[in-house]
Amino acid sequence: MDYEGKPVEFTLGTSSGGASLAPTSSTTAASIAPFSYNTSATNYYNTTPSSYPMFLNYQYAGGTTVTTDMDAFSGMDMSMNNGVFGTQNNPSYFYPTTQLNTYGYDTLAAATTASGITVNNNQLNVNIVQGNGTIVPQPITQNIISTVSNVQSSVPINNSQPLTPTGLAGCSTSSGSSSASSSSANSTSTPKNTISKANRSSGGANNSQFSTEDRECVNCGVHNTPLWRRDGSGNYLCNACGLYFKMNHHARPLVKPKKRQQNAQKRTGIECVNCRTNTTTLWRRNGEGHPVCNACGLYFKLHKVERPITMKKDGIQTRNRKLSAKGSRRMKKENGGTPTSMGMPTTSSSISSGIELDQSGVWGMKNTQPMLMTPTAYAFPASNFYFNSIEDQLEYKTCPPMMVDFGGQMKNLNLN
């Protein structure tokens, strides 16, 4: 058997009908009694022979002897030799000062004893006794140490719970059982919720399909609509008729009403009392209530006098609200070049307007009028502001002259 990477030989010892693992060097009925505990606390280095119920209480016996004065016994070796079992004054620093069951060694020994672990040619045979007394042999050919470390504590097996491949049913703590029950509940509830959601969605689709096949709008008679509504009597209405009824409180008309057209019979014989025209886009009335055309009515409304007859035109003048391509070309010809951009006058326009531009042509300043500018209103970069000299600072105590860089040329702005 491999223990801590070193080979250790064990044999099967029996005592009072039980079986446990014990070292080959010493196997007695007192030392391998199942479920036995060391009742008295022993010093860190055991000075008297004691019973060791489990092989894990010992360290592997090496051939090298190390003699130091670290312990209380001068000249005593600290390694576990083969004569440690039953030999007095050999230290065993693997034997703690408290009870062994505090560290779980005896619990593990009891589990292996109750499970009936036998070692034979690197094969670990585990006989697990079920609640009904049936012995189920479980041969395991894996590493013995890894197998023994997986053995659980000896807990009475519930008859109602079967043996599972992962472990003994019911052999768990309260937290483990609660977590297992919660996990099993989750595993069973998840498919149920999924199935119920799927049934609900499929059932809802089927119900809506079957329930809407025989529906008909009582107003317009359609059978398909994004949303069915009801009128005041509870009858089904399509979405359009339902919304119309909700907003207007009466049934939606089946025929779309035509736009109101002016009756030509009514307007026959009407003429403007001012310019005597019979054609206009809109008839108006003057201050005396007589009908006038749109042009005469607007002129009287703005100027409070009648529109002169000389302003009458043959056709009706309309307003071009959108600039057509022809009009834009005409404006380009009138300007004598490309259209100017807003806020950025060109050289030709600036010369005609009397504005002097710097070399970069980015910013212009009028020579005739001073430029009113305050630092609070115009935030220029701090690198463009500087004083000419110290005398300027003394002379202009409140606000010295400001030098502003406009596109490469320095402009002296006197703010006083």
UniProtKB/Swiss-Prot annotation:
- Keyword set, alphabetical order: Activator, Cell projection, Developmental protein, DNA-binding, Metal-binding, Nucleus, Repeat, Transcription, Transcription regulation, Zinc, Zinc-finger
- Which Gene3D superfamilies does this UniProt record tie to the protein? Erythroid Transcription Factor GATA-1, subunit A (3.30.50.10)
Where would I find the GATA-type zinc fingers in this protein? 217-241, 272-296
* One of the GO biological process terms: positive regulation of transcription by RNA polymerase II
On the tree of life, the source organism's domain of life is: Eukaryota
Q: Which GO terms describe its cellular component?
A: axon; nucleus; perikaryon
Q: Which InterPro entries match?
A: Transcription_factor_GATA, Znf_GATA, Znf_NHR/GATA
Reported function: Transcriptional activator that binds to the consensus sequence 5'-[AT]GATA[AG]-3' and variations thereof. During embryonic development, required for specification of cell fate of major hypodermal (epidermal) cells at the blastomere stage. The requirement is true for all four lineages derived from ABarp, ABpra and C blastomeres. Required for seam cell maintenance in late embryogenesis, for proper formation of dauer larvae and locomotion. Regulates expression of bro-1, a regulator of seam cell proliferation, via a GATA-like binding motif.
Name of the protein: Transcription factor elt-1
Organism in which the protein naturally occurs: Caenorhabditis elegans
Gene that encodes it: elt-1
